[in-house]
Curated annotation (Swiss-Prot):
It is found in: Cell inner membrane. GO terms for cellular component: plasma membrane. Its main location: membrane. Keywords: Cell inner membrane, Cell membrane, Membrane. It comes from Thermotoga maritima (strain ATCC 43589 / DSM 3109 / JCM 10099 / NBRC 100826 / MSB8). Could be involved in insertion of integral membrane proteins into the membrane. It comes from the Bacteria. It is a peripheral membrane protein. Belongs to the UPF0161 family. This is Putative membrane protein insertion efficiency factor.
Amino acid sequence: MKKLLIMLIRFYQRYISPLKPPTCRFTPTCSNYFIQALEKHGLLKGTFLGLRRILRCNPLSKGGYDPVPEEFSFKPRRRWS
């Protein structure tokens, strides 16, 4: 199931994302973050982290560097910068 989700994200990156202007406010991009979260934390936790990141990526967000956390937590990390 994890591999299928990664394949869907890669499909989005290759065929859909190039058709749209870049809008992600974060580094790494939300789709790359989602893949890294799945690889590092597995299907359930990685999906939770990826969806939480996508919800944070909006015009009201400052964005910036936001890597996948080493340790999983349901609580969002505090960013003081």
